[in-house]
Amino acid sequence: SLCAWQIPIETNSAHGDAQIEMVDAARIRRELDAGRVVVVTGFQGIDERGDITTLGRGGSDTSAVALAAALSADELTIYTDVDGIFSSDPRICPDAVRRERISYDDMLLLAQKGAQVLHDRSVALAQASGVPITVKSCETGSRGSIVCEQGDVSQVVGVTQKTSDTSQLAAITAVGDALPSVEHERAVVSALERGGVNVYAI
């Protein structure tokens, strides 16, 4: 097993919210070439002064993406307690559908709007590095979902977050190439209003 300072995973000095600046994969490659299974401590790095830093929320996922990029991995698999990425929160919407593939842009938007499957920093780093991420359950054996450059076609992703103070308020994220158009924005709002949904903000 290796800690961040042994690799090293170099970061800036923003303790508690450090940004990864560089990963030297040479030590890991040597261990892999020797036939060893390498376990790396996530969520941490080392700054230019040699001080240990922590990456903050989503730091473990971000560490995994950074390591995958440094190793030129074909794919990164993140095991979690969910079966993948769904069209909406299955705890709120029982009919939520698992997405086979979702684009980096869509996943980044979902993460920024409250979906808690992946942190937005890890998604942004994966997109910049071209690392596909497979998200799957460690319990069910589901195929999970792949976050990659080109997702499957779906315009309305669905409910991503429900506020804790009211059960009647939800955030809905609509994605798609046509959505910046005012005409399409009006069409989405009109469809919601016809369904009896009051639009609070856009």
Spans of model-derived segments:
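Short, glycine-/Ser/Thr-/acidic-enriched flexible segments
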Residues: G45, S60, D83, T140-G141, ...
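Short gly/pro-enriched beta-turn/loop segments at secondary-structure junctions
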Residues: D33, L71, A128-V131, D165-L169
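Short hydrophobic alpha-helical runs that function as membrane-insertion/retention elements
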Residues: E75-Y79, I133-V135, Y200-A201
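A conserved active-site cap/scaffold subdomain adjacent to cofactor or substrate pockets
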Residues: S103-C148, S154
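A conserved regulatory-domain signal marking ACT and ACT-like small-molecule sensing domains
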Residues: G144-I202
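Short linear Ser/Thr-Pro motifs
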Residues: S60-S63, S137, N198
